[in-house]
């Protein structure tokens, strides 16, 4: 449905479109995508799009305007780079000029399912599939809400505009994602990747909410039949979406949550799942969610049958699907729950030295939250691929707008107050490092999580790891005991000891950044021994 180009607020943004399409229905979006030749439908009717050169976020192209209202709060550094007001103004003028007389799609909605702390938002895009992405991922307003919705924060996405003066501006590339927190505006140029809008709003929520004493978290969440909720923290690819989507528990959300005085709540209205090697046997709920109204990104498909090949990474390893949360059958109404009983940190340990599951004290949980360890396998296709440790504070450093200790303090206070249990789960390798070790079996990890959530794991006898200082169970119902003690799973015990010591050193080295000045966050004694 086309609406007047005078849609409230557009002129104030400096936008002069030829046509405006506002909060389209899924059927309308589908027709626009086809008419604009933006995508192809798969054999089961799911829209498939290609996001162009960028198949992932561009973290080095993310900036915040250095302005008085926010400059003393922002965690400046490699994650949040300063840009001047003058450069923002210049690029803002270029972006609005670029969108002049174009057909625009406008999504108005919300972020945050808690009425007290949600923000109303507007996303302006030039492509129908980006409008589709927003409709899937943000909270869709009712007709009544839409009629009176006054956006507090706006994203203007001119993905087709590239900044030709980036060198003169001292920026990283012709791509930019710039936030002006005083004006409550974000402008995007040069990248079509949908995740920039999703994580852009998350970065904004990570600024405003903690300042109101509400913890924002890069985690998934679900709730059991008795109202017992659990949080799953982890970096991309560690299993947040997969492990929180559980047929026996209701899904609250798969990636972004808040925790306030009433409990936990989802920030989003949809899920954004990785689809590489998606298997209907091990991930039936996600597989079933991929249907009409879902949106597949950068997948490879058969040109004739349009059947998707989920095993192919020909375009990217980061193949994705976004879908509205109601595509999952077993969801928590309202996407919120009471205070969590359990916090689980997920790590993909490519060194294969961490236990399959470890119980953490609150102090150990603080250490591991600030460390945010996972490991990825770097390198080219030729030659040896060695694991590379990645330390991403709060298991989501790229989206943290305030200093990591700000979130850690809130997490520690809430965990103590509500007596929350914490566990560290290795979804990575067992029996050796990359090249030798095998990926932790998904059914085994699910069984470990079931035993944590039903409380049975507490009955186990625990052993303290001599290097990592965490406690791991000697047995877990339904799980092969040899994977529980990581050293036992290695053929060469000396190799294990050396690899564990190497990783411990990296933990210690990384944590030094929290040891300067105040000792408030010195949890180093609860971390690995190097």
From Swiss-Prot:
Q: Which GO terms describe its molecular function?
A: ATP binding; metal ion binding; phosphoenolpyruvate carboxykinase (ATP) activity
Recorded GO CC terms:
cytosol
This protein's record includes keyword Calcium:
no
Sequence positions that bind substrate = 57, 193, 199, 320
Which BP terms does GO give this entry? gluconeogenesis
List localization entries.
Cytoplasm
Biological function? Involved in the gluconeogenesis. Catalyzes the conversion of oxaloacetate (OAA) to phosphoenolpyruvate (PEP) through direct phosphoryl transfer between the nucleoside triphosphate and OAA.
What is this protein identified as?
Answer: Phosphoenolpyruvate carboxykinase (ATP)
Q: From which source organism is this entry? A: Leptospira biflexa serovar Patoc (strain Patoc 1 / ATCC 23582 / Paris)
